[in-house]
C-alpha cells in the first residue's frame, strides 16, 4: 500500500514538475519572441525617424535657398540691368517651386497597434520616441504654414520680372528674406536623441 501511495505521489510530482517546466520554457520562449518583435519594431521606428530627419534637412536647405533667392532679387536695381537670365530663372524657380513636407509616423502607429509599446520596458526610451514624433509633427506644421504664407504673398506670378519689380513683389521678397527657417529653428535634435537611444537599446 505504501509503495502504491509513494508511486502515485511520485507520478503526481512528475506531472506537476513537467507542467511547471513546460510553462517556464513556454514563458521564456514567449518573452524571447516579444523581445525580438520589440527590436524589429524599434528598427522600423529608427529608420522612419532617420527618413524624417533627412526630409527636414532637405527642406531646411530649400528654405535657405529660398531666402537667398529673395535676397538676390532685392539686390537688383529697378531696371534689373545686372540680372543674368540664368540667375533669374534659377532663383525664380526656387521662389515659385511647389514645396511641401509630410513626415511619416506609420512605424509609431504600428508599434502602438501591436501593443508592444509597453513591452519596451524602458520608459525613458518610450518618452524620447514619443517626443521625437511630436517634434516631427510640429516641424511639418511650421514648414507647411511657412510655405502657405509664402504662396499667399506671391500669388499666381506669371511674369517674374514684372512681379518682383512691383511694390507688392518687393514687399513679398523682403518678408521672405527676413523670415527665420522653421526647419532650423525647431528643435530637430529630438529626433537624433531618440535615434541614439534606440541604438543603445538595440
Where are each of the predicted segments found?
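A generic short-segment signal for beta-strand/edge and adjacent turn/coil regions
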Residues: 13-14, 32, 97-98
Amino acid at each position: 500500500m505504501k509503495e502504491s501511495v509513494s508511486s502515485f505521489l511520485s507520478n503526481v510530482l512528475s506531472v506537476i514538475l513537467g507542467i511547471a517546466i513546460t510553462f517556464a520554457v513556454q514563458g521564456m520562449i514567449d518573452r524571447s519572441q516579444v523581445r525580438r518583435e520589440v527590436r524589429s519594431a524599434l528598427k522600423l521606428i529608427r529608420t522612419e525617424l532617420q527618413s524624417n530627419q533627412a526630409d527636414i534637412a532637405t527642406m531646411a536647405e530649400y528654405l535657405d535657398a529660398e531666402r537667398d533667392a529673395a535676397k538676390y532679387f532685392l539686390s537688383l536695381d529697378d531696371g534689373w540691368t545686372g540680372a543674368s537670365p540664368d540667375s533669374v530663372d534659377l532663383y525664380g524657380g526656387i521662389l515659385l517651386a511647389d514645396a511641401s513636407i509630410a513626415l511619416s509616423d506609420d512605424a509609431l502607429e504600428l508599434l502602438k497597434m501591436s501593443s508592444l509599446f509597453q513591452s519596451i520596458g524602458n520608459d525613458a526610451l518610450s518618452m524620447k520616441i514619443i517626443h521625437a514624433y511630436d517634434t516631427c509633427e510640429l516641424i511639418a506644421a511650421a514648414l507647411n504654414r511657412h510655405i502657405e504664407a509664402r504662396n499667399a504673398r506671391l500669388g499666381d506670378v506669371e511674369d517674374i520680372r514684372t512681379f518682383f519689380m512691383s511694390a507688392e513683389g518687393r514687399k513679398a521678397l523682403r518678408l521672405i528674406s527676413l523670415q527665420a527657417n522653421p526647419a532650423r529653428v525647431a528643435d530637430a535634435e529630438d529626433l537624433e536623441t531618440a535615434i541614439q537611444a534606440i541604438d543603445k537599446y538595440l
